[in-house]
Amino acid sequence: MRIALLVHHWRQGLFYPRWVPELVAGLGYPVLSYYAPATYYLVGGGHLLGVPLAGAMAGVFVLCMLAGALGMYRLASELFGDMGRGASLVAAVAYLYAPYLLANVYVRGAIAEVGAQALLPWILWAARRLMMGADRPAVSAVTLAVLLGALALTHTVTLILFPPLLAGYLLVLWWQQGRSASRLGWALAALGGAMGLSAFFWVPLLAESGFLRQDAFTTSIEVFIPENLWNWNTIVDLNFPFEYTFDVPYQLGILQLVLAVAGIASVRRWTLEWRYWLGVTLWAGLAIGAWSEPLWLGSRAGLAIQFPWRLLSLLSVSLPLWAGWVVLRLHRRTLQTVGVAVLCGATLLWQRPLVAWMGSLATEQGSMPLAAIARHEAITGQWGTGPTREFMPRWSQALHYQPEETDVAAPMQIRLHALSGEGVDAQVTSEQGGAVRLTSFYFPGWQATLGDGTLLEPVSSTSLGLLTVDVPPGSHRLRLTQPGTALQRWATWLTWVTLAGLVALAWRVRLYGVAGVGAALLLVGSLAVLRGPVLNPVLSPAQPFATAALTLLGYRVEQEDPGRLHIYPAWFVMQTPQQDLRLGWEVLDSTGQRVTLAATRPYFNSQQASNWPPGTLVDDAYEVMLPAGLSAGNYTIRLHLLDAENRPLQPSTLLGVVALRATLPAQVSGAEQALALRFGETLRLDSYMLEGPRAMAAGTTLPVVRAGETLVYSLAWSAIAPPLQDYHGFVHLTDAQGAVVAQDDHLAGTFFHPPMSWGTGRVQRDSYRLQVPAGTPNGLLWPVVGLYQFESLQRLAVADSEGQRVGDAYRLPPVKVYTAGDRAAPQQTVDATFGDLAVLLGYDLVLPATGLQPGSEFQLTLYYQARGPAAADLTQFVHLFDPGRGMAAQLDAPPLRGANPTSAWQAGEVIVESLTLRVEPHAAAGLYTLGIGLYNPLDGVRLAVLDRAGQPLRDQIVPLTQLAVHFTFR
């Protein structure tokens, strides 16, 4: 989400947005002032070039992993020498398949930390080459400065953890190599260059950390540190393969630990350098243990790190090196080759990421719309896209407005010229002057200027800590922008000077690639620094709109992508609205026909108007989804004030006319099945599709699935009217008796695009994944679809296309479960053939120990092997009959009570059914024939049957055996 916002600001012309105004429901958040953004820029660059956001992120993950593995290979090659190529390969594979690295990729999605892990072996490699004299010192120094500067911009926590390790390594190498003053000087120069390159980030990070609340530190003390330390039961994962889960603390793999111990035992010569690596391994491992808790809690740096298991980043560098020593212990080259193959193969098998159980939040659009980000914050409570609100300004004491007597709106006239997250340009007229607030947190770096050049001091006001400016009496042109603090500007210039120096030095030592990249960054950075703030012009509404609480000053419109219209109204609040504000945005074509209508609450349905203090200038936002296949042209926008039930409270207001680009045509699959079902009063299920290639049952249209496989149902919803709630949807797989065997319940639509964001006239896709449980018997399962209110669990009524109610859910056509099993082994063979349907292989019979008597029960198990499906669903009959005595027992029912009807039988399928029959209480004593057959329930016609010799059987009945019924006298 942060990456999507970064790309959004690039498109607005802002290269490095320290302040992100779209976060925290439009109140803003200084996330990129305190969170290192380098990997965000890599992903954002790919996305800007047209790669879907999820794809760009996956690509950067792969790039970082492979780059880190190559760096580990180079570092290990430096340490092991020319004879250690196999050992270096083992180290690279051990790094690439380190469980913590893979957990960061597949479980945590921690792209910044993965980027930092990729840099660590390269930094150590460059440091070693600098101190060991492998290259000209200037070349190694430039390389080290660039890599270490990149680390500072990649992951802040790793930057806290790694410098002590690097400093110790440099000193060890310097001492081991004869303590050269020149090499030490170049090392210090490289460290200084890295600090200068990243000064624009780390200087404000440290100097301005006091601008933030202490929530993150408090949470670290109370929760993060105590719950994320190792104890004796959580150090090592003993599973094969390694079990990747969300459980914390993260663990070492047993194979990792065994190889490390074996490698340490294999070291032939304990140089100072290898003793240092042993110390790093022991220190990092011990520091994650519960015994180190006082050290973590007693250090501000420890509290900032939050999770002690982040030291696994350092262990992910040292442990692979020990694995390489296991190979070096093998003296013969043949043994080393075998050892490399065995260790690499074992690492791949043991620590491979088995994470198919995880879901994905990737959006279907390939991007992350602003509205989706706002809704995510509101639904999860992760304001600022993080659980701890670690970058919340200290002036904000609450996220919900708490009125005070001094919070009043001064009488004033405001004519708005321009407004955006970067500032405001307005003409403010007031006889007495007064405070103008913005729906933005106060944070240092804002600058307020009047038209005559007078500077006003921005301050914080209200319990929210809103940005506020006291405007003097009279009529003034007020311009409020955010150029940043003086310290931020100074640190930025220090970075440019350092970068220019490194470009010159890199060119001099013939590092032309480094020099070229640095020169490009200088150019881009210079343009970013020289660029002024971009304030978006505001349009005046065609008709005035006002309530007792607020007035519409203007609006702006952006078509973010062809199918998504953003409307940004600007309000001035005279008094805090006491009732929930719901607005309807209607788009009409040139003939006056409605194209779409969306109804929602303020700021992408993430904020309440009761959070707006008096005297506040509100930069609001709404999303309107445009229907597929909309033609380009001019469209009219009307504004509706609605009550809680979406009923109009006053006549609609003409906002204006906007030119829209054409939207993409609707994509209809040939596998789409039409439905036209209405759910409640606002939603319609137009169609559904069973996604993925599915074999069809022979002679039928039934999809076939094996037990253990997953079905994906894609539903196509549309809104008849704007939904009043974010309904939850479900698809349940049920058996013939209605019992649920698998289900998927979630917020209808997608997590980032729930029902209340749906406008009319547009199809909304919704997917449900259902895994057929292992061991599910062959037969039919029915998917049942519905919607319900999450709080009450009350389902919405379902009506068909004629308006007739069909219940509170709808059963879709069934699927056939068919899993080939063991061959049938009946106790008694029969081999009777029912036409092209099936062969009755045989049966089992279990009689009471006392024999059959009137009223007693006995069990019959039938074994069929299907030859193909029947044209109709036949009924099976089992009769215990004698012509003279009549019927002693009878059972007529579809096979398996309808769970596996004959129309769904597949060639080769074995159908086994156990039946319980009861002898009639008034049955006469005597000998009866137990026989079975099949008939069509529509006309009663029995299916012809042949015996094993191919001869027709009389009355189309298969005689199984004769059973005697006895009387018992008391």
Regions found by a protein language model. Name each.
Residues 80-88, 132-140, 146, 175-179, ...:
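Intrinsically disordered, low-complexity coil segments
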Residues 70, 309, 327-331, 339-433, ...:
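Extracytoplasmic
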Residues 1-360, 476-481, 488-531:
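Membrane-embedded transmembrane-helix bundle of lipid-linked glycan/lipid transferases
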Residues 19-21, 152, 201-202, 293-302, ...:
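Tryptophan-centered motif/residue detector
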Residues 401-508, 877, 882, 912:
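Active-site-proximal, structured, solvent-exposed surfaces of multi-pass membrane proteins
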Residues 356-373, 386, 391-409, 455, ...:
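Extracellular/lumen-exposed scaffold segments
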Residues 47-48, 424-427, 556:
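Asp/Glu-centered strand-loop micro-motifs enriched in Gly/Pro and often flanked by an aromatic residue
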Residues 216, 425-430, 559, 563-565:
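Membrane-interface loop/short-helix elements at transmembrane-helix boundaries
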